[in-house]
Amino acid sequence: LSVHVAGNWGKAELGGEDKQLSIAYPSLMKEIFIEIKRNNTLENFEVVMECTHHGPLLTKKPSMFVEIGSSEKEWSIPEAGKIIASSVMNALSKKITKTKAVFGIGGLHTTPILTKAVEKSEFALAHVCPKYNLENLDEKMIKQVFERSCEKVEFALLDWKGMGKEKTRIIELLEKLNIEYKRTDKM
């Protein structure tokens, strides 16, 4: 069971456009994630925030994907659908408290380190560029992250151990753009 915003850090292999991000709604994504965790009764389903990936490209209104697994096997489990539906409805029935949005950089597709760092904090993930896409992270894409969130992105949150060989280049890029960054291992 997962929540994420759509977008492509590189080539658009699953819809959308190359190197284009949809508009994120960090506080609502976090609220839905929390509701799914609270409502999840399925033993074989992990609840995760995923990195930004796939299309479509939506740039007029904030959007997100709330997903049940990645195959027909998971999609056909009625209880999973009920958990997702009730979680989304519960979240939408609340007054969403604006959080401080952050740009996640590095780590796995399912963002365990970044999610853990923000889950019980005042912060919420906007876009997340995972380790496998860091080579596509350039000045244009970083600027796009800060432009394509309906809430102000406060800083970049680095999955320090999940940045690999791109770490130095990305830090230099963030410093060049005067973007504050924090390390997950220091939070």
Q: Positions of the model-derived regions?
A:
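Solvent-exposed alpha-helices and their adjacent loops that cap or buttress functional pockets
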Residues: 39-41, 56-60, 95-97, 149-150
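Short acidic, S/G/P-rich loop/turn micro-motifs used as interaction or catalytic elements
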Residues: 73, 161-165
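Short, aromatic/basic amphipathic alpha-helical patches
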Residues: 118, 166-177
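A generic structural motif
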Residues: 179-187
